[in-house]
Amino acid sequence: GVHMDNEKNLKDEFKKADIESINLCHHREIRTATINDLEAVAAVEAECFPAAEAATKEEFAERIKFYGDHFWLMFDGDKLIAFVDGFVTDEENLTDEMYAKAQLHNESGAWQMIFGVNTIPAYRKHGYAGELIKCAIEDARKQGRKGLVLTCKDHLVHYYAKFGFEYEGVSESEHGGVKWNQMRLKF
């Protein structure tokens, strides 16, 4: 009978673990964006980037209209705590005009661009942005893209390399008057 008890205990442990992991996922739901998320998205962006670099509410309205399905939003309860967004294109390099021109999105494009990776300050250093980046990578892979492209500042090159992005050199982008590095993940 001892053997059976052990098995039952194990089953109970698994059940408990399942419930805990479900709660965790429920606690931090990840989903795509609709226009109802506009206020929250713009507020998180404003909290994460200086004005010269932050996308405006009007720009996000356009982005959500054209590629809301290429936003990955993470919530803590009802609160938006982090998001990643970017459109899809056949262009191989990320250019400044892409940020402002959401209509350049091409749903059947080869490359998933990443325009923004934002986590509000109080929720940083928990790996939430990383989870969203992994979601974006996973979705791009499922959708048959060639890969993903992003630009980042010097101190983040190493961070994105951990996800499989390779450094391609200094980007032509002068977004916000800052130097950006282009990184690419190829499938």
Language model features with spans:
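Short, Lys/Arg-enriched N-terminal segments with co-localized hydrophobic residues
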Residues: G1-H3, A17, S21
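A short beta-loop-alpha structural element at the N-terminal edge
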Residues: H27-V41
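Conserved GNAT acetyl-CoA-binding A-motif
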Residues: I133, A140-C152
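Conserved glycine-rich acetyl-CoA-binding loop
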Residues: N106-S108, I120-K134, Q143, V157-H158, ...
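Active-site rim helix/loop that mediates acceptor-substrate recognition in acyltransferases
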Residues: A51-G77, I81-L104
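Conserved catalytic-core motifs of GNAT/GCN5-like acyltransferases
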Residues: E13, V88-E91, T151, A161, ...
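Conserved acyl-donor/pantetheine-binding loop and adjacent beta-alpha core of acyl/acetyltransferases
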Residues: F83-N118, R124, K134, S173-K179
